[in-house]
Design a protein with these regions (language model features):
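Non-catalytic terminal/linker segments enriched in charged/polar, low-complexity residues
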Residues: 1-83, 332, 336-337, 352-353, ...
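Nucleotide-state-sensitive switch-loop elements of NTP-binding domains
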Residues: 40-94, 99, 103-195, 202-209, ...
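Long, well-ordered amphipathic alpha-helical subdomains in the mid-to-C-terminal portions
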Residues: 56-57, 272, 283-361
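Alpha-helical scaffold elements adjacent to nucleotide-binding pockets in ATP/GTP-utilizing enzyme cores
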Residues: 136, 173, 198, 202, ...
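Well-ordered beta-strand positions
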Residues: 184, 205, 230-231, 269
Length: 366
């Protein structure tokens, strides 16, 4: 191998030592300057109770975290914030993709803040994709007015987790938002699968947004979704679509007659509106507050809140048991083998599951 640097052409050249490390321009900037002081649970609680949305956002991030250390702090913060929660009106908003939920929530939020004052938090239940583990986080960009309003707090869905886990975290986020002084909570869900049922289990009023002019409006709606709806609103009631919307509203009203009377005693209403033009928004929120007054008067409001608290207690038990089962080292070693026996036809799914459960409980006994 040739080394041209050793040739006579370069013989008179020398290599200088060079300069040493450059000193920091700002003498007050020390090593580790980017280290942030870790907040304690007391710091989070203090910031939340003062209405500091930056601290609130950080606390919600702790709630969404799967790190055990974060979870421990989050639970302490939630427990200390619990006495300051429960004073909001919680509204669930659901509808199929394309129904205009985000635009509608933007208009709903601006209207209710203008008419009722106070503060509004917008949350989401959007379980991750089973394939990519990603979820829809673009709603905030479509809420152009609320996203810059000083009295609003918009929190997109966690980016990973099962429906039960995401819903529980949303429920806990509601507690933190209420403690921070948000007296109106919107919980948005994509409106497919079981997410609307989870949403219904944490709100006072469940609003279903529908579209007209898509064929048989009633055919594509699950009976269960209509049964849990306290109000149905048909969006895009403008221009040439007005007659179609009113015709669809009549179809929905007729269909509601075949459903049993809701436990609340309230008769669900069907209204038309335009989220784009903002028409009909006032009537929707008049309906929401009529419902709240109605159920507070007959005692159903408090009853439903208590039932929801019990429901989430049992859901938390189920989730923790599930997590503990799958994190058990013995079970993790046996899962692949159990899968193989099922796929080979040596055992049924139920037998394999029972064997794993028996092993798990025996392992607990030690």
């Amino acid at each position: 191998m040739e080394h041209p640097e050793n040739s006579s052409e370069f013989a008179g050249l020398t290599v200088n030592k060079g300069i040493g490390p450059v000193s920091i321009v700002n003498p007050y900037l020390k090593k580790g300057r980017f280290a942030r002081r870790k907040l304690t649970a007391a710091d989070y609680v203090e910031g939340i109770l003062k209405g500091n949305v930056t601290i609130l956002g950080q606390a919600v991030t702790l709630v969404e975290s799967t790190v055990p250390e974060h979870q421990a702090i989050a639970q302490e913060v939630i427990e200390k914030c619990l006495p300051y929660s429960g004073n909001s009106v919680r509204v669930g908003i659901s509808g199929v993709p394309g129904a205009g939920k985000s635009t509608s929530i933007d208009e709903f939020g601006i209207h209710v803040l203008k008419e009722k004052g106070g503060k509004l938090a917008v949350l989401a239940i959007d379980p991750s994709s089973e394939r990519s583990k990603g979820s829809i986080l673009g709603d905030k960009t479509r809420m152009e007015k609320l996203s810059v309003h000083p009295d609003s707090f918009i929190r997109p869905s966690p980016s990973a987790g099962s429906l039960g886990g995401v819903a529980r975290k949303t429920r806990e986020t509601i507690i933190l938002c209420e403690a921070a002084g948000f007296d109106k909570i919107f919980v948005e869900t994509v409106g497919v699968g079981q997410s609307e049922t989870a949403c219904h289990s944490m709100v006072d009023f469940f609003l279903l947004i529908q579209l007209a002019g898509t064929g048989d409006e009633l055919q594509g709606i699950k009976r269960g979704i209509m049964e849990i709806s306290d109000g149905i609103c048909i969006n895009k009631c403008d221009g040439e679509n007005v007659d179609k919307c009113h015709l669809a509203a009549t179809s929905f009203r007729n269909a509601l007659h075949f459903f049993p009377q809701p436990e609340s005693g309230w008769t669900p209403k069907v209204l038309c509106y335009s989220g784009f033009y903002g028409t009909g928004i006032k009537e929707i929120w008049d309906m929401v507050y009529q419902y709240i007054d109605f159920v507070k008067h007959n005692g159903y409001f408090e009853y439903r809140r208590n039932e929801q608290s019990k429901y989430w207690m049992y859901e938390s038990i189920n989730e923790h048991l599930r997590a503990h089962f799958y994190h058990n080292e013995t079970i993790r070693q046996l899962l692949k083998k159990a899968e193989a026996t099922v796929l080979a036809g040596e055992k049924t799914s139920f037998t394999a599951a029972q064997d794993l459960l028996d092993t798990y409980f025996n392992d607990l006994k030690g």
